[in-house]
Amino acid sequence: MPWEFLKKCDRQKAEVRGEKEEQEPVPGNPHFQVQFHVTSCRFAFLAFLAGSFLAFSLHALISSNLFWRLRQLHHLPTAHYLQTRDEFAVYSVDELNAFKEFYDKSTADSVGATYTEAEETNIKEALSSLRLAQDMYMAGKDDKAARLFEHALALAPRHPEVLLRYGEFLEHNQRNIVLADQYYFQALTINPSHSEALANRQRTADVVQTLDERRLASLDAKRAALSAIHEANSALRRAKKEAYFQHIYHSVGIEGNTMTLAQTRSILETRMAVDGKSIDEHNEILGMDLAMKYINASLVQKLEITIKDILELHRRVLGHVDPIEGGEFRRNQVYVGGHVPPGPGDLAVLMQRFEDWLNSEYSSSLHPVNYAALAHYKLVHIHPFIDGNGRTSRLLMNTLLMRAGYPPVIIPKQQRSKYYHFLKLANEGDIRPFVRFIADCTEKTLDLYLWATSDLPQQIPMLIQTETEAGEQLVKLQSPQMASIPESFYESGSGALP
């Protein structure tokens, strides 16, 4: 029998190797029961290991998601909240690398983004205008080229090619290297691998840094000149009083308050109501007055600013408008235009990081204007309150400036659109235009004080309001000296090469 012969051969081979032929287990046999028990134990042990591994993996995944959620909160690393934007403000050499690492949109998302039909139409028209603009520029028709570039930018404000070519036009034709550098930077935020934008940025970065440093040195010189004036100087005291009214008037005006400067002054001096104005508008002015007095009496002298100080500041800002919400973190999610602030559950962590940053050695090493502008942006970006975030942020900014010897900076309500535009640019990754805007406002405020305390025979600078054809209120300085300053000086981002 072939089959039996083969089995016999196998048994003989096993005996030669010294192996024992195992008897085939049969159900009911004790050997089968022992083997079944051992197999069950092995299965249970393997199941335990598999379950442990699954639980560990699930825990790691959840922890990782939580970590990355916090890490990517507002697209920035956990340990250094808004550190990337800080580096932009102080012009770190590594700003591009930091930007590429932490920017909120990946290269793939930016480059491979899909557009709606209307957006695609706008992009096609923008690129067509861009080609015409370049042709006009080559033909020497600079005015037409400038208008076509602006038209292309209006149609596609976030198209890398439009930003790049318009920046080159501004750099070489208009000699506005600061604005050109800003557009190169924006092009890189959308497409970090854009080689031409990167090459242009590397060429302009050092020049722009020099211009910005020169601007800050000019502010320091004007601050020193103002500090040299004795506090008992009557003109200085009158200027401070007038600036106090202006600061409150403009700060509430940015938020939509319709009170005029004269009405604001009347409310603060007489505490009498103004006919035809809402109670909330009155209370906003009174709240700012309380907050300013708190700063002068307490915060300016403090070595460190804490979360409690910021809450106390906000409590006074909303003290008359909404005393329940005043001094309290919001408990709901809010939306501010295209910006989505952090959820209420993240506010405590972010505000603690903000406090740590405010009082860190790194912050103390910044120029006071950079430091104050960054603090302003950080707080308004976190948006910790249900209302009054802008007013509280501007008050905090002025607290930091006053501690450094600067006067409270006035951000004119007429520049509200620029103010919000530069905040939007900061949200997109470049804080520098916002810092320059604050530097502009600081310089104008210093000029106002220096003019008021000069030996010129004219009266102190008063602000008058004139009505435009559209009924819009404008504020102008009654001053020959200020009138001699070119209009471009008042435009934010004035950094044209001399």
Curated annotation (Swiss-Prot):
It catalyses: L-tyrosyl-[protein] + ATP = O-(5'-adenylyl)-L-tyrosyl-[protein] + diphosphate; L-threonyl-[protein] + ATP = 3-O-(5'-adenylyl)-L-threonyl-[protein] + diphosphate; 3-O-(5'-adenylyl)-L-threonyl-[protein] + H2O = L-threonyl-[protein] + AMP + H(+). Its EC number is 2.7.7.108, 3.1.4.-. The side chain of Glu-255 determines which of the two opposing activities (AMPylase or de-AMPylase) will take place. In response to endoplasmic reticulum stress, mediates de-AMPylase activity. Adenylyltransferase activity is inhibited by the inhibitory helix present at the N-terminus: Glu-255 binds ATP and competes with ATP-binding at Arg-394, thereby preventing adenylyltransferase activity. In unstressed cells, disengagement of Glu-255 promotes adenylyltransferase activity. The active site is at H383. A motif (Inhibitory (S/T)XXXE(G/N) motif) lies at residues 251-256. Protein that can both mediate the addition of adenosine 5'-monophosphate (AMP) to specific residues of target proteins (AMPylation), and the removal of the same modification from target proteins (de-AMPylation), depending on the context. The side chain of Glu-255 determines which of the two opposing activities (AMPylase or de-AMPylase) will take place. Acts as a key regulator of the unfolded protein response (UPR) by mediating AMPylation or de-AMPylation of Hsc70-3/BiP. Belongs to the fic family. Homodimer. This is Protein adenylyltransferase Fic. It comes from Drosophila willistoni (Fruit fly).
